[in-house]
Amino acid sequence: MYGRLLFVYGKYLFKMKIVVLGPAHPYRGGLASIMETMAREYMRRGHEVAIYTFRVQYPSLLFPGKSQYVGTPAPDDLRIERVVNTVNPLNWIAVGRRLRRERPDMVLMKYWTPFMAPCFGAIARIARGNGVTRVICQIDNVEPHEHHIVDRPFNRYFLGAVDGFVYMSEQVHGELKAYTSAPM
């Protein structure tokens, strides 16, 4: 894939250091479950994996009603750190610098809404500055269901900082082509 990874006969010959960045415990829902499952699969294949999830995912003003959190204990088999604050630009810089210092081979980001673009874009741009880390995006939606005037510039900012994509549908693939020529 990116020089330090060789895939032969279904086995990885080099152990990768991977940071999964996105929803995970204590956040509820399918996105968190998917990210935890992906982390477990990479671990099963022998890679070193950490999940960086949110200290603040959405401000409570944007998440009225139900809780964002599950009421169960954290999984014992995953290293989950609550480090990302999506509404604090100083935090984005700190997380990006931390990743740049830690030099993971891959940061795998989950992207589903342009609301995350400023945060994820800043983190990705800073983390990639070490010349080692590659940012891969597992993307559910490019264009949100409810459109806002900032969607296109936010998407352009984040998607331009990504080295490769895993998309969830042909529609998303088509939408991605309007923003980037990165591998998909």
Positions of predicted regions on the chain:
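Helix N-cap/beta->alpha junction signal
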Residues: 111, 141, 169-170
